């Protein structure tokens, strides 16, 4: 599960960094999604904050449990992976409904949706 540790660190630290730079407003305008300053779209984006922070918290907690050889790490990792998948899926569904196919927003969300699938299957197989 060494590779899962790498994915969790990239994803969880990445989410925390994304929200910090979003909060302080240093994302260059060229990287902002279409209609970023529309209050409804801004609210939609901020609605992901609690979900993304839960992903980071559960992922990092899972790594802590794993390092202590605590068997609960698998359950916490599964929670983090399912939340990560949901986060990517929700964003891609939104962009699809809007017919907005900006690769700079699609790639990160495809990553969030696809990488967890492998580990979800792996963890479920280990439990049975």
Ranges and model annotations:
Residues 89-106, 122, 128:
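Membrane-helix boundary connector in multi-pass membrane proteins
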Residues 52, 75-93, 109-117:
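Hydrophobic alpha-helical membrane segments
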Residues 57-78:
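Juxtamembrane helix-break-helix junctions at the cytosolic face
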Residues 34-42, 98-111:
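Non-cytosolic membrane-interface motifs at loop->transmembrane helix junctions
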Residues 21-28, 58-65, 89-97:
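Membrane-helix exit/interface motif
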Residues 11-54:
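Hydrophobic transmembrane helix segments
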Residues 1-10, 124, 128:
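N-terminal membrane topogenic signal
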């Amino acid at each position: 599960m060494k590779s899962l540790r790498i994915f969790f660190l990239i994803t969880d630290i990445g989410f925390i960094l994304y929200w910090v730079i979003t909060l302080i407003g240093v994302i260059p305008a060229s990287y902002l999604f279409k209609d970023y300053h529309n209050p409804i779209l801004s609210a939609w984006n901020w609605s992901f904050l609690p979900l993304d922070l839960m992903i980071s918290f559960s992922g990092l907690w899972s790594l802590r449990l794993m390092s202590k050889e605590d068997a609960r790490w698998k359950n916490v990792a599964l929670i983090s992976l399912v939340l990560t998948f949901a986060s990517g899926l929700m964003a891609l569904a939104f962009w699809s409904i809007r017919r907005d196919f900006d690769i700079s927003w699609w790639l990160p969300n495809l990553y969030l949706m696809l990488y967890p699938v492998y580990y979800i299957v792996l963890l479920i197989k280990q439990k049975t």
